[in-house]
């Protein structure tokens, strides 16, 4: 029933640049094998593109990594991949992520989740079957855009509109989102540099300043990874 409602209320059928490029990713890379393996696993199983790859297609950037979301649980993802002889590893399985390896391509496949408990660094999650529930736990609207293999967008938080307008909007309460994971302060800066020519919202800056010390709770590995991404941002040096 949830998938039916998604198709009616939250999906947009596109025949434009975005749709065609997402279709090309499906048809011209081994991603089609992932879609076949998971979508055919059961009558209700489904996998969708999510996050950065869609954001980059919309902004006509080079897609250099592909993240996928699925309503299968991690052990079911493993079984679906085994059924099609697709290699994978389970290093992120505790957080719901299985990484499939096909030729030179890596695909991170993450089960739908909802947060049970957060501490500013990590979240304790519970797996879900609800796409809107998964979208609601993500950090920014521009990262909560999904697409099926045919390029039909599922965008419950109006992320495409925000991306087109250069609006970097937290999903839900900004302070709650930051306190769940203080890395989101740096992610906000990176996405703002990349995608916005607008002025910062004063309230957002107040909240960031109020919580800036939370960054000290983060591991050096996570901080270094985010700083590397920040320095590679299109607008980092203007």
Where are these regions (language model features)?
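Catalytic cores of the polymerase beta-like nucleotidyltransferase superfamily
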Residues: 1-238
């Amino acid at each position: 029933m949830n998938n039916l409602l998604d198709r009616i209320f939250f999906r947009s059928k596109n025949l434009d640049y975005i749709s065609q490029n997402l279709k090309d990713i499906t048809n011209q890379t081994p991603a089609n094998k992932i879609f076949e393996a998971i979508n055919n696993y059961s009558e209700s199983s489904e996998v969708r593109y999510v996050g950065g790859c869609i954001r980059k297609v919309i902004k006509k950037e080079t897609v250099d990594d592909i993240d996928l979301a699925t309503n299968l649980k991690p052990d079911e993802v493993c079984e679906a991949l085994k059924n099609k002889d697709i290699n994978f590893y389970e290093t992120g399985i505790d957080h719901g992520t299985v990484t499939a390896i096909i030729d030179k391509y890596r695909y991170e496949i993450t089960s739908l989740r909802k947060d049970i408990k957060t501490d500013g660094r990590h979240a304790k999650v519970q797996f879900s079957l609800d796409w809107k529930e998964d979208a609601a736990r993500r950090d920014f609207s521009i990262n909560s855009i999904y697409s099926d293999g045919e390029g039909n967008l599922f965008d419950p938080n109006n992320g495409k509109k925000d991306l087109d307008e250069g609006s970097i909007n937290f999903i839900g309460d900004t302070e709650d989102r930051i306190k769940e994971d203080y890395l989101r302060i740096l992610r906000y800066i990176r996405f703002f540099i990349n995608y916005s020519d607008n002025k910062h919202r004063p309230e957002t800056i107040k909240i960031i300043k109020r919580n800036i010390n939370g960054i000290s709770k983060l591991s050096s590995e996570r901080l270094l990874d985010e700083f590397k991404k920040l320095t590679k941002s299109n607008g980092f040096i203007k």
